[in-house]
Amino acid sequence: MADPASYRPAPGSIPETPGVYRFRDEHGRVLYVGKAKNLRARLANYFAELHTLHPRTQHMVSSASSVDWTVVSTEVEALQLEYTWIKQFDPRFNVRYRDDKSYPSLAVTLHEEFPRLQVMRGPKRKGVRYFGPYAHAWAIRETLDLLLRVFPARTCSGGVFKRAAQVGRPCLLGYIDRCSAPCVGRVDAATHREIVEDFCDFMSGQTGRYLRRLEREMQQAAQAQEYERAARLRDDIGALRRAVEKQAVVLPDGTDADVIAFAEDELEAAVAVFYVRGGRVRGQRGWVVDKLDEVTTADLVEQFLTQEYLDGTGAASTGTAGSTVPTTTAGSQGEGIPREILVPALPPDVEAVTELLGAARGSRVEVRVPRRGDKRTLLETVERNAKQAFALHRTKRASDLTARSRALAELQEALELPDAPLRIECFDVSNTQGTNVVASMVVFEDGLPRKSEYRRFAIRGIAGREGAGREGAGDDVASMYETIHRRFSRYLAERSRIADIADIAELGDIAGAPGAAQPIDPGTGRPRRFAYPPNLVVVDGGAPQVAAAARALDELGIDAGPGGVALCGLAKRLEEVWLPDTADPVILPRTSEALYLLQRVRDEAHRFAIAYHRQKRSTAMVASALDEVPGLGDTRRKALLRHFGSVAKIRAASAEQIAQVSGIGPRTAAAIVTALARSAPGRADAPAPVVDPRTGEILDTETVS
């Protein structure tokens, strides 16, 4: 028996979306299939303390050795996919229906003179049209209850129909307008069959024309002041919209297609494939592959199609430098080439690819990108699964102790460091056309993010400072210089402070071992800010940013090299690693764990900087000259704006007029007049007006919305 904790997914790796999940044993056999509105919440229940679980659930989770899942858009999709997988895998821990029959379908007995709508199980019969299957019979009855208001077809058995005809009275459904009562001659056979055919068309997905027709009739009834009829039509429209929730996992009209989607970054790509046969998802496969070089999504599609369908070896070699990592295997049914293949982008030479596929299949094959409708929705579902598989792969890789150790060892070797860089700090600068310039510092220790050590910097501007490079706060190079200078100035200040408050003999050689200088604040017990020196500094950028960071360290007397604080930069376009005072970058292998770690660190710094920049930009959009008035809080600012209407009108008012506003005294009114006069447009020392970067609007004349 396995311990469920041994295969529990990493925290945060399970999405909070609808989906279907599978527990497997050590041999890959599916033990249990379930569905959930919220996968994270549902799966968390299985990994609770064993003694709190139902005995059958205890046995299942102890017998399993892995769990995987597929995300879908709605609960309806989850029901359909759950049914498909239960039928396909026959999991021994799934509950059987009491009648031990197949799942129910909504059947229409078209072979009868007066067709009947009913719940039907078992093998299909000739002359009967089926919709479904459904997971539960009550789901069919709920659907019928909604649709019979619009399509009042017969639902009674043959005996009930015959008795009603004999006595000349319909059943209850006939009296409440849920049946057109053909048993007593209210409609003839042709009219009743027309109702049934309309019902079948609607259930097949042709919903638009019925809804449009009913909406026209509702508007006409309202114009004719037939309000009761208009209200009924309104309710009918609502019933139709509730009854049929579009299903992205199921395609109408028995479509056979393979649906392919990708999620990728610079080094890897995840591919997910749904195999649709007879309009239903019959299988799913997924891989994560390494990219050998710079390839587009269209290139990935071409490689996948040729190798998966023509080589007969599967997708294991698709754009890879080695073996692939299977992410999900759900009983693929992709051995044959379908008539239609849906992809996110057409291959560069689509004609040649389709010709090869057609020759292998023996008939025409269409490769296309769906733009709208059910097929587009299904492709988006597959894309979500590819992204989820890719995110899960990255999470597993990042949390793999062996991979992290290898990454740090590779970094040590590539950058010629004396020790593995156990503490890495990465810096990134973010701005919008030189405004609201900010920088971020993220910290990775032992290859994992340490978010409590993250720091943010509002760039103040360093124009004219020696060694700053080009001038201006909006200059990324100058901003990087300022950020590095401020961070390590704080470090030196903290080190000096520790030396001042402690006995030098007890601290040891601070200059030689700065990390050993007791960087814990005795008052709070927490680490001092900026007290720890990094083993490696990474800047987001190429040679110019690295040179600026090196100048900042040099000015502070810190060696930017293997003997001091190691420094490098990661350029985005080609993922090159730049070192100080080198003409050429270091090129790490694209499959290198070291490069993967540097990317994660750089991407995290970029995310953190962007978040802070957006916060600053949002604040600037609602700033005004009133913010400069000392002692004027948000409540009184709003009161002033409500009273006068805008900052410009407040500026034109006298101190006496301003003092009439509730909560504003004479002293505060005088301070407001002085501050607004100082910031008046046209003065040489007036600050530039705040401008909304999205619209170009000058926000100095802020008004109350």
UniProtKB/Swiss-Prot annotation:
It comes from the Bacteria. Residues 315-335, 683-705 are annotated as: Disordered. This is UvrABC system protein C. GO terms for molecular function: DNA binding; excinuclease ABC activity. Residues 16-95 form the GIY-YIG domain. The UvrABC repair system catalyzes the recognition and processing of DNA lesions. UvrC both incises the 5' and 3' sides of the lesion. The N-terminal half is responsible for the 3' incision and the C-terminal half is responsible for the 5' incision. Residues 315-332 have a biased composition (Low complexity). Residues 208-243 form the UVR domain. Its main location: cytoplasm. Pfam families: GIY-YIG (PF01541), HHH_5 (PF14520), UVR (PF02151), UvrC_RNaseH (PF22920), UvrC_RNaseH_dom (PF08459). It comes from Frankia casuarinae (strain DSM 45818 / CECT 9043 / HFP020203 / CcI3). GO terms for cellular component: cytoplasm; excinuclease repair complex. It is found in: Cytoplasm. The gene is uvrC.
